Structure formats: C-alpha cells, structure tokens
C-alpha cells in the first residue's frame, strides 16, 4: 500500500549511465515508490522491465507518469495539467496520484479519488520556482482526502518536517538520484 511509503522518487528525464544502479540502491531497504518520468528517448520496454524487476526485491511500487503513459492497467501519476484535463474512469485496482500546486488542483484530485498527491514546490528548488512553504503545504495536505508528499527543494532530512505538517513523506528527483 502507498500509505506505507515515506519516500517517492522521481526518475530524471535524462538518466545517466549509472541510472540502473541508482534505481537498485533506491529500492534497497524499506518499501518505496518510484515515478517513472523519462524523456521519450529513454522510455524503452527494456528499461521499464529492469526498473520493475528492481522494485520487486523490496516490494516497492512503480508508478508511471502521465507525460509518458496513461494506460488503464498501471499505477499512474498525473501531471497537474493532465489532472485538470483528466476525463478517464478511475481504475480501482491501480494507484492514481497527482501533482498539485494549489487548492483547485487538490479539489480535482479529491474528485478523482486520487490515492496520493505531491504538493509542490514546498521549498525553493533548482528551477527557481516560488516556494509555497511548509505552512501552505500543511493547509493543502489537510484539504486532501488521501495522503500527501512534499516535493520541490526537499531533502531526505525534511521527512519529519513533512510529517509535522500533515504529510506522509517526501518526493523528489535530486534528493534520490
């Protein structure tokens, strides 16, 4: 179950040579989740199978980003744009999550009965996006009917801060990869 997960990694768009080793290291230990978000040039069946196999060792969860795939037979993470435009039917046997930046997106995630949301950017990130801060993160997390993860500028050490503000865990690219 996603409720057991404290860390959700997100793959870099352009993975480096040591990417699969980093994926294996990421999946070591406790159960985690990984959102596959790759540039089309790297989105191959071979790579996806290797990631899926690595996840099985720790009973971890693989989720596909909607930028790559909105298949009905997979765990799917919706970008905020895809969330707001989503008209599909919810598949109950699979996870559905979404990226949220404001109350309107949180409400849409509630309407779709998403299992989790990533709220961002909580802190100043490498892209210079304006952070919402921990207080706003807590407000948005409280307004969501499922579980929430902090994303954007967070580090592994911020896990307790996320939990203290009503979150379940943290999510990120650079903090894991």
Regions of interest found by a model, annotated:
Residues 49-63, 83, 89-102, 130-153:
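Alpha-helix-loop-beta-strand connector modules within alpha/beta enzyme cores
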Residues 22, 26, 61-76, 101-113, ...:
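Catalytic cores of alpha/beta
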Residues 80-89, 116-130, 156-177:
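Glycine-rich phosphate-binding active-site loops on the catalytic face of alpha/beta enzymes
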């Amino acid at each position: 179950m996603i409720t057991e997960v404290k860390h959700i990694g997100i793959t870099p768009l352009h993975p480096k040579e040591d990417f699969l080793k980093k994926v294996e290291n990421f999946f070591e230990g406790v159960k985690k989740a990984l959102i596959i978000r790759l540039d089309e040039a790297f989105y191959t069946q071979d790579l996806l199978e290797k990631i899926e196999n690595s996840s099985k060792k720790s009973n971890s969860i693989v989720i596909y980003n909607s930028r790559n795939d909105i298949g009905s037979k997979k765990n799917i993470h919706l970008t905020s744009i895809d969330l707001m435009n989503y008209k599909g039917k919810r598949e109950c046997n699979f996870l559905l999550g979404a990226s949220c930046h404001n109350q309107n997106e949180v409400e849409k995630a509630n309407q779709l009965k998403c299992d989790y949301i990533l709220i961002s950017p909580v802190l100043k990130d490498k892209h210079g996006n304006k952070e919402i801060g921990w207080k706003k993160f807590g407000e948005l997390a409280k307004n969501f009917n499922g579980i929430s993860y902090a994303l954007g500028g967070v580090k592994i050490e911020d896990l307790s801060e996320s939990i203290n503000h009503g979150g379940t865990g943290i999510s990120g690219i650079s903090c894991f990869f």
